[in-house]
Amino acid sequence: MSAEEVLENIRKEIIKKSPKEAKIVDVQFEGPEVVVYVKNPEIFTNEIIKSLAKDLRKRISIRPDPSVLVEPEIAKQKILEIVPEEAEITNFVFDANTGEVIIESKKPGLVIGKEGKTLEMIKKAIRWAPKPVRTPPIQSETIKAIRATLYRERHEVKEILRRIGRRIHRDIVVRGDYWIRVSFLGGAREVGRSCLYVQTPDTRVLIDCGINVACEDKAFPHFDAPEFSIEDLDAVIVTHAHLDHCGFIPGLFRYGYDGPVYCTRPTRDLMTLLQKDYLEIAKKEGKEVPYTSKDIKTCVKHTIPIDYGVTTDISPTIKLTLHNAGHVLGSAIAHLHIGEGLYNLAYTGDIKFETSRLLEPAVCQFPRLETLIIESTYGAYDDVLPEREEAERELLRVVSETTDRGGKVLIPVFGVGRAQELMLVLEEGYNQGIFNAPVYLDGMIWEATAIHTAYPEYLSKEMRQKIFHEGDNPFLSEVFKRVGSTNERRKVIDSDEPCVILATSGMLTGGPSVEYLKHLAPDEKNAIIFVGYQAEGTLGRKVQSGWKEIPIITRNGKTKSIPINLQVYTIEGFSGHSDRKQLIKYIRRLKPSPEKIIMVHGEESKCLDFADTVRRLFKKQTYVPMNLDAIRVK
């Protein structure tokens, strides 16, 4: 049966089971949802929608028909008339494709009203579905640009969703000899260019598609694998916004991919920021990049954000559920339910199985699980990291001692994740009087932090409590100063004042952190603190390993040696990855316990060591694939 025939059957069922007074205008597949356009959406109660979803076994979305929506400018005025001024509305975002209007205000409770009465009044007056959110304390240019693109290209986005929907809902007959295999196109026995290719007789799914920024000759996944074909690809899933997991996604669109990208909303925004930053840095350094800014926009238009815990059809036989991974904002464990109860596979991406200042720990309970693919960054026997409190004390000690002697502290960080964790520690240390110096934020850190403030529901309970109930937002502290230009960076470097500098990139592979290192390295009163993983071959690993001189390429393309006289520290307790103890604890706590466990995302020796330990401790089948290996899991 074709997708059109499937849709026609669904349309008839919905019309038959829906109240006539709802006045159904159209029923369409849009991405993973069946969208019902009606003239009177308020007729559809939650009970009716749940009943339809259960009977049809599809996600049902009820939307107002565009013909009944009040013009946005008039709608704004009506909302302002209904909502009390004390709510302090700051912005409206109208989404014509969903019929929603996001209402940003400083007091969203007043937009909702007692028992939701104000929301009901808004809905009746404008017919749009109001979605009240708290005004982000720092405005994000990335989110603004994404919203503008989706609004401007709304007709194209709708067509994209309908095309994707028809592909997802095509009718498939599941064979008796149904098989499932996973090919490892990158990130096996290495850290960088993570890329898994899941194949079944009827579906092809890519999970992550990263770039190894530290190694030019092994930068991209193995798209030359004989089984891989971009034309056959049904879906791409992104676990989180770090370049080694999402850096190549726009390149897929450049080379012919035209399907969906699934991830959480924060991941969509953060990966867009990272990809743009990667382009800009590569351009400045004269490096080739496999895509353009136009491809990043195309990627945004094809991205379908899904929330944690929401099960979504991504093909006729595969359902995807994303769960919190605890690694960075919006990071996810991808759980695939394949066939009707046939097989369940989960890929952790990068996980942190511990509550951090910023995030809750990774989820370890699933409805069903036969195979787990898990990261092994810190999987070796001696990969036991210090306690976080100990790491925080050590960080503040080094910062205090260095600034007291008039030095500058450079902390190279990933713009997403570690930077925000460190901001929280430094803000607390500054408030306690442990050090008295400004903290400069360079690279994309300020913008990444703005995106964090837009998604408070993804932060830890403690952070939400601080921001919403205690009125204390650490990200807005006076200690933080934004470095927004080359001139401002120059002033920080030339100034005699002691300070702390958080700058990207975290492994000194490019960006402002390298620029600061050039100028701070010769002076022994300065210090550099490594707080994240330094991959083999990176400048960060060389400095960390004790090199006394490092080669730096100048702007005119010549190589110059820089002496390393500054103090070098490594403080490991801030990693966003689980250490060996946490990885073992995670496997012990997994419910249900999987039959097979596959180790990836770690140096070869660490993957092998971790696999051997898990095999002995838990009596499980373990695998340590190499790149280009394929494992048949079913």
UniProtKB/Swiss-Prot annotation:
Optimal NaCl concentration is 100 mM for nuclease activity on RNA. Zn(2+) 1 binds at H240, H242, H327, D350. Zn(2+) 2 binds at D244, H245, D350, H601. It is an enzyme of class 3 (hydrolase). Binds 2 Zn(2+) ions, which are required for nuclease activity. It comes from the Archaea. Optimum temperature is 60 degrees Celsius for nuclease activity on RNA. InterPro entries: aCPSF1, Beta_Casp, KH_dom, KH_dom-like_a/b, KH_dom_type_2, MBL, Metallo-B-lactamas, RibonucZ/Hydroxyglut_hydro. Residues 179-381 are annotated as: Metallo-beta-lactamase N-terminus. Its cofactor is Zn(2+). Terminates transcription on the whole genome. Termination is linked to FttA-mediated RNA cleavage and does not require NTP hydrolysis. Cleaves endonucleolytically at the RNA exit channel of RNA polymerase (RNAP); the 5'-3' exonuclease activity of this protein degrades the nascent RNA released from RNAP. It holds the Pfam family RMMBL. Residues 70-137 are annotated as: KHb. This is Transcription termination factor FttA. Homodimer. Interacts with RNA polymerase (RNAP), interacts with the Spt4-Spt5 complex. Belongs to the metallo-beta-lactamase superfamily. RNA-metabolizing metallo-beta-lactamase-like family. FttA subfamily. The gene is fttA.
